[in-house]
C-alpha cells in the first residue's frame, strides 16, 4: 500500500541521523491517522485537498491545523488515494490539467425571505480562466512541452533499497508538462483571480442549513481543467416572534384575563403580510393552543403549506382598583 511504501521509505531505522526523514515519517503517520476519520474523508471527497488547507473551505481553524511543509501534500494525496482506492487521479487529468477547487459561500437570510423566496446577488472572489492564454498557461503563440523527466506521466519511480517507490515528478510537479515560456498575465497558472457577481435563486420554503450547489461556478481549473463548483450554505436568522419546526410555525400570544374568562377575539400577524382573526372561547386556559391551517411555511418545491400554532399566554393585571379587587375576591 502507499502508506506502507512511504512509511518504509522514511522509517528512522532506514535513515539514521536523517532529521528530514524522521519529520516525513511523523507526517505520514499523522496523515494516515487523520484520514481514518470518516468526516475528514468525506470533506476531502467533496472539496479535494483544498478542504485541508488554510483551515478548510471558509470554516476557519478546521482541517488545516498541524499540516505544514512544502512536500506534505504529495504524501497526503498518496495515502488518501490508497485509502479510497482511487490513486492520485482526483482533480488531475492528462496534460497537467487540474479541476478547480470548490468554493463555499455563507449566506444568512430572514425567515420572511425563506417564506417567500428571493433572488440574491452575491460577489465571489474566485479564480477564472486567463483570457490571454485561454487557460493553457503558455504565452500566446507557444505551447507547453511534455516533461522529459517523467515523459508526461507526472510520476517517476526511484529505487529505495529493495523497494521501488513512485513519487511526484520533481521537474513538472506532477503536471506531465512544463511551460518554457509562461503567460505574462497568469504566470503559467492558466487562471487569474477576480471578483464575480452571481445571481442565486433561493426557493420558497428553504430550510436552515440547506446547501445550494452552483455547478461550474467555483475556481477555474488549472491549465484548461474543468471548473469547480460553488456551494451556498444558507442559515435562517432566528425570528423575534415565530419559531419554526419544519413547515410549521409556532408563536405565543398574550391575552387579557377578561378575554380568557369571557371569550373574545384577537388578531395575529402572519408571514404572508396579512392578519388572521382568532376566536377565543370562554374559560380559555394558559397554554391553550390554536391552529391556523395553511398559515405556516411553504414546503420546498411543493404546493403544500404548513400550519401556524398559537399558544395562549394570559396577562395577569398588576394594578387593581378597589372595585376590581372586590370582584375578583367574589370568585
From Swiss-Prot:
A zinc finger (CR-type) spans 117-195. The gene is dnaJ. Zn(2+) 1 binds at residues 130, 133, 183, 186. It is found in: Cytoplasm. The J domain is necessary and sufficient to stimulate DnaK ATPase activity. Zinc center 1 plays an important role in the autonomous, DnaK-independent chaperone activity of DnaJ. Zinc center 2 is essential for interaction with DnaK and for DnaJ activity. InterPro entries: DnaJ, DnaJ_C, DnaJ_domain, DnaJ_domain_CS, HSP40/DnaJ_pept-bd, HSP_DnaJ_Cys-rich_dom, HSP_DnaJ_Cys-rich_dom_sf, J_dom_sf. Its cofactor is Zn(2+). It comes from the Bacteria. Keywords: Chaperone, Cytoplasm, DNA replication, Metal-binding, Repeat, Stress response, Zinc, Zinc-finger. Belongs to the DnaJ family. Residues 1-48 form the J domain. Zn(2+) 2 binds at residues 147, 150, 169, 172. CXXCXGXG motif repeats lie at residues 130-137, 147-154, 169-176, 183-190. Residues 11-22 have a biased composition (Basic and acidic residues). This is Chaperone protein DnaJ. Homodimer. Participates actively in the response to hyperosmotic and heat shock by preventing the aggregation of stress-denatured proteins and by disaggregating proteins, also in an autonomous, DnaK-independent fashion. Unfolded proteins bind initially to DnaJ; upon interaction with the DnaJ-bound protein, DnaK hydrolyzes its bound ATP, resulting in the formation of a stable complex. GrpE releases ADP from DnaK; ATP binding to DnaK triggers the release of the substrate protein, thus completing the reaction cycle. GO terms for cellular component: cytoplasm. One of its GO terms (biological process) is chaperone cofactor-dependent protein refolding. Residues 1-22 are annotated as: Disordered. The keyword rRNA-binding does not apply. One of its GO terms (molecular function) is zinc ion binding. Binds 2 Zn(2+) ions per monomer.
Amino acid at each position: 500500500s502507499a502508506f506502507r511504501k512511504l512509511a518504509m521509505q522514511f522509517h528512522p531505522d532506514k535513515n539514521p541521523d536523517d532529521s528530514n526523514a524522521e519529520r516525513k515519517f511523523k507526517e505520514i503517520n499523522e496523515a494516515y491517522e487523520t484520514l481514518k476519520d470518516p468526516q475528514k474523508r468525506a470533506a476531502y471527497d467533496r472539496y479535494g485537498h483544498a478542504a485541508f488547507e488554510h483551515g478548510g473551505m471558509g470554516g476557519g481553524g478546521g482541517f488545516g491545523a498541524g499540516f505544514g511543509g512544502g512536500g506534505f501534500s504529495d504524501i497526503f494525496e498518496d495515502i488518501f488515494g490508497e485509502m479510497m482506492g482511487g490513486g492520485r487521479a482526483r482533480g488531475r487529468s492528462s496534460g497537467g490539467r487540474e479541476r478547480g477547487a470548490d468554493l463555499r459561500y455563507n449566506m444568512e437570510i430572514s425567515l420572511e425571505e425563506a417564506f417567500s423566496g428571493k433572488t440574491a446577488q452575491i460577489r465571489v472572489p474566485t479564480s477564472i480562466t486567463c483570457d490571454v492564454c485561454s487557460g493553457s498557461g503558455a504565452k500566446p503563440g507557444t505551447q507547453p512541452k511534455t516533461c522529459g523527466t517523467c515523459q508526461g506521466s507526472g510520476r517517476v519511480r526511484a529505487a529505495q533499497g529493495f523497494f521501488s517507490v513512485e513519487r511526484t515528478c520533481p521537474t513538472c510537479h506532477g503536471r506531465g508538462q512544463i511551460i518554457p515560456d509562461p503567460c505574462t498575465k497568469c504566470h503559467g497558472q492558466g487562471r487569474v483571480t477576480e471578483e464575480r457577481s452571481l445571481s442565486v435563486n433561493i426557493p420558497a420554503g428553504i430550510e436552515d442549513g440547506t446547501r445550494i450547489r452552483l455547478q461550474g461556478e467555483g475556481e477555474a481549473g488549472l491549465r484548461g481543467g474543468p471548473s469547480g463548483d460553488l456551494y451556498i450554505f444558507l442559515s435562517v436568522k432566528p425570528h423575534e416572534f415565530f419559531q419554526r419546526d419544519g413547515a410549521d410555525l409556532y408563536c405565543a400570544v398574550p391575552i387579557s384575563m377578561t378575554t380568557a374568562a369571557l371569550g373574545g377575539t384577537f388578531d395575529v400577524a402572519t408571514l404572508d403580510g396579512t392578519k388572521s382573526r382568532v376566536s377565543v372561547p370562554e374559560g380559555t386556559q394558559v397554554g391553550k393552543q390554536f391552529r391556523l391551517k395553511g398559515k405556516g411555511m411553504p414546503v420546498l418545491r411543493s404546493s403544500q403549506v404548513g400550519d401556524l400554532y398559537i399558544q395562549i399566554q394570559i396577562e395577569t393585571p398588576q394594578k387593581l382598583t378597589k372595585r376590581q379587587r372586590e370582584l375578583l375576591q367574589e370568585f
